[in-house]
Amino acid sequence: MINSRQNIVIGALLVVIGVGALGFYGMIKRQQHLEQGYLQLCADIEGVIDYKPEPQQVVERVVSNAQLWRPVQEQIDDTVVQIFSQVAEIDLLQPYKTPAQGTSSGSGFFINAEGDIITNAHVVDQAKALWIQIQSLGKRILDVHVIGVSPERDIALLRLSDESKEIIRKELGSIPFLPLGDSDVLRRSDEVMALGYPLGQQSLKSTTGVISGHENRWIQISAPINPGNSGGPLLNAHGDVVGVNSAGITKAQNVGYAIPINEVKIILPDLYTVTLLRKPFLGIVFNNATDALTDYLGNPQPGGAYVVEVVKDSTLDKAGVKRGDMLYQINTHTLDIYGEMRVPWAEDKVSLIDYVSRLSIGQEISLIIYRNGAQHEIVTKFEQMALPPISEIYPSYEPIDYEVFGGMVVMPLTINHLQLLGARAPGLAKYMDIQQRAE
């Protein structure tokens, strides 16, 4: 019995082993078949495309900021100056008092071999005496004076005295200067360098960053602008000036603002001939339009900027623009219902107000307006309008008109007064509106 049982068990084991062997053999054959099929497929593909794998090179380009900007740093010696001013600040609420005395400092840069300097208007505001220092001459004082200033644009043009020019030429051979670049080609993420003398420090400092974008007429950069840096140049990687450092935000990090150099180039010829250059004004006030308003007026869709006020004797008033008109184009640039347009020099739309900043006095402008469904084409010249009765005054460059009667000061109301009085005279706030000032 035992032998029979053993034979049965042994037989069963042989059957299991045989079945397993057959299964294993089948698996091996299938694997070989798959491998042969894969190899044949690869051979077919290789025959079709003649594929020959080659080793690929890994290209790595690492340039540090120091390497990028070192050639620029070598070109800027003595082109960036530190500006000092003796300030006499007038109190317009008490103009009869002796002006408050003080000193301030800022930065600037030479723009030609004649010793002309660009800086911010606020750097030289109410300055009674001005002088500069440059790196190679240490603390030696070089006298400068104001040729022209545009306070609303925050730009001033200075010039070395003849004696100071000779000092620099004797020591350095010539007056070094920076080339003016093209701010219209700037785009977000472009690298820039801001130069100046922050916090009144004696040594030239540089900070690097990128173009963050444009905000109104300003270039916003990630390089911080500190007090004392104002008026210094903003350079591109080629060493060209693309902006004038102007403002920083104390409660923000890595935020600075610069004036596009192309705006400076537009007004530069006028600064040589006009001491106080005011910002031109088209002479209209506009509101956002709507599709419903456009249809109601019978004007084509999409609409343009809706004119709600026209200032008397302004450029567009003389050209025939009227209240209720809809402005569709200016110099071939199409306006939307918000008064904004696409221009070649900006990635984002710019407002009509910012566009006007790029117009120069005497420049011809063409307009397309619609009035109750009828198209009108207007061609006129951009002119400096007469100042409205209530305007801002600049004591450094124009006289202050006042009289004192029995301890009472009588003088024309100005924007300066409105800013100084603020909440103490709420009834005067309406005169901040341009239309109210002109009436």
Regions found by a protein language model. Name each.
Residues 31-104, 116, 120-121, 129, ...:
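N-terminal activation segment of mature serine protease catalytic domains
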Residues 61-71, 90-116, 140-143, 177-179, ...:
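A conserved glycine-rich beta-strand in the N-terminal activation segment of trypsin-fold
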Residues 83, 129-136, 192-196, 363-371:
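Short conserved beta-strand and strand-loop elements enriched in small hydrophobics
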Residues 108-110, 144-146, 211, 234, ...:
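Conserved hydrophobic positions within beta-strands
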Residues 109, 224-244, 316-319:
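Catalytic nucleophile loop of clan PA
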Residues 112-155, 160-165, 172, 183:
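Catalytic-histidine neighborhood of serine endopeptidases
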